[in-house]
Amino acid sequence: MSQKVFISEDDEYLFGQGTHYDIYDKLGAHPSEEKGKKGFFFAVWAPNAADVHVVGDFNGWDENAHQMKRSKTGNIWTLFIPGVAIGALYKFLITAQDGRKLYKADPYANYAELRPGNASRTTDLSGFKWSDSKWYESLKGKDMNRQPIAIYECHIGSWMKHPDGTEDGFYTYRQFADRIVEYLKEMKYTHIELIGIAEHPFDGSWGYQVTGYYAPTARYGEPTDFMYLINQLHKHGIGVILDWVPAHFCPDEFGLACFDGTCIYEDPDPRKGEHPDWGTKIFNLAKPEVKNFLIANALYWIRKFHIDGLRVDAVASMLYLDYGKKDGQWVPNKYGDNKNLDAIEFFKHFNSVVRGTYPNILTIAEESTAWPKVTAPPEEDGLGFAFKWNMGWMHDFCEYMKLDPYFRQGAHYMMTFAMSYNDSENYILPLSHDEVVHLKCSMVEKMPGYKVDKYANLRVGYTYMFGHSGKKLLFMGQDFGQEREWSEKRELDWFLLENDLNRGMKDYVGKLLEIYRKYPALYEVDNDWGGFEWINADDKERSTYSFYRRASNGKDNILFVLNMTPMERKGFKVGVPFDGTYTKILDSAKECYGGSGSSVPDKIKAVKGLCDYKDYSIEFDLPPYGAEVFVFQTKKTKN
């Protein structure tokens, strides 16, 4: 039975303060009942409107049928309309102070019309029955910094197309659920990061120009279908991260821009309210109601849809007032510099509320500069994020791996530099969609050499990534050697898995993921030197790297030896920290992975003798583009 929904004076007060964190239960369109009649309660923030009406298919889009009432503060307009059913299309018809009539989609709508339509649609989120309690039980008491996190970044509409021949070829959320769960479990990813979920009008924006912040896109079904997808992922032990875009919004006239005839979501000064590079509007974070809109939105996805994390897009564009702008296109802050004080306060507020309420929620910053303390807590003057994408590592990795092996010795430092600042933040190593578009080539096509060399290069490169400190992220298709760049218009080239090299690559990444999750040395201590030690970081003449990851309990330490050239290194000697047997757990040169074969023994006994400043060493023939991974135990000493 529907309950009566209404806006109280307390609601208005808290919203005006920017602290009404469940305002999404009041603003928007909600099933309600008044005087025994069922219908929908509509509410919209439009403080400068002269008048507001609700128009929809239930009243023939009649401009005069349903006039809303202004609240006591004058900022919010409300109306209960009996008889409105679930699934009805509607908009707010706002009359501006100058007489203009603006047809606006509901900023707080939970569901929207499928593009090219842009109306909002009524729905009821309360009907879905969740069954993911075991997932939440499994998270209790866990420090996510000390857990394995391996993220599969995915765009639903282009992951796989339906063979039914329809124009879009989209699988529904429910159809996608069954397929993606099977894939993620097979590969052993811990999380999926979904891009393009919040409603957006243009497919080519990939979901980064949003019009419906509270509406899962209708491209793949209804909101309850999206709930089903998350529920299924949780039931199989897979976390869900959502791409979230608080930096800017779509300028389309039916959306948030100039919403009530004035700029209530953006700053009216284009130097503050517009992003020239992207052609988008910038949220005015000085306004409490705008901050409330965004922070409540984050909580909405967590509470209503059981989202486990938010990857926050374009953080740098928010922190710097002059980001992507020329002189004269931006306004300094009150101190005369380029720091966006409102954005800094917003991130501290956002993370304090979200992570203070839900400690295991992953808030992840895509921050591309050296802004300090992104993952430090707000009480230490940090922004409070759980993790930050390590864009510096990503850049150096891609630039190095693209080089002809002959020139790699001159860029040897590019693969070691990231460890020099690794302890400054809690990092995720991202190889995301941004690296495989706009003529940047897919990951495998970035690699030098003939086809077999490209795959060998990528195998050793990925091994370096999984051995390096930091959580992991791979974009879809890059785990099996997708050769074309990503396009939102087509599915991944799954047919490539008919080829030995691609099957080998998929199996190899699957093995990397298995090893990563199995051995705590690879994830327990990611952000200080206690978990990582170079054996030899300076062998630039041969372009080899050796290091080991140290387990906190002294057991199952992992040694990595990498050869970044096509030259076999006969009798390769590497220093090791302890006596004992080193057991091989991964060999990139194996034929089953697409390699040419390897003679590296499964077990190698350490020999006493100084090497690489270590008291012991092991010796073997290091294959061309070889990645050799060993597990070993700390030798116990008697007291």
UniProtKB/Swiss-Prot annotation:
Family from the record: Belongs to the glycosyl hydrolase 13 family. GlgB subfamily.
Gene Ontology terms describing biological process: glycogen biosynthetic process
A Pfam family of this chain: Alpha-amylase
CDD domains xrefs: AmyAc_Glg_BE (cd11322), E_set_GBE_prok_N (cd02855)
Assembly and interaction partners: Monomer.
Function: Catalyzes the formation of the alpha-1,6-glucosidic linkages in glycogen by scission of a 1,4-alpha-linked oligosaccharide from growing alpha-1,4-glucan chains and the subsequent attachment of the oligosaccharide to the alpha-1,6 position.
Enzymatic reactions: Transfers a segment of a (1->4)-alpha-D-glucan chain to a primary hydroxy group in a similar glucan chain
Group of enzyme by EC: transferase
GO cellular component, one term: cytosol
Native source organism of the sequence: Butyrivibrio fibrisolvens
Pathway: Glycan biosynthesis; glycogen biosynthesis
Keywords per UniProt: Carbohydrate metabolism, Glycogen biosynthesis, Glycogen metabolism, Glycosyltransferase, Transferase
Protein name as annotated: 1,4-alpha-glucan branching enzyme GlgB
EC number: 2.4.1.18
Catalytic-site annotation from UniProt: 313 (nucleophile), 366 (proton donor)
Listed SUPFAM superfamilies: (Trans)glycosidases, Glycosyl hydrolase domain
A GO molecular-function annotation: 1,4-alpha-glucan branching enzyme activity
Top-level lineage group: Bacteria
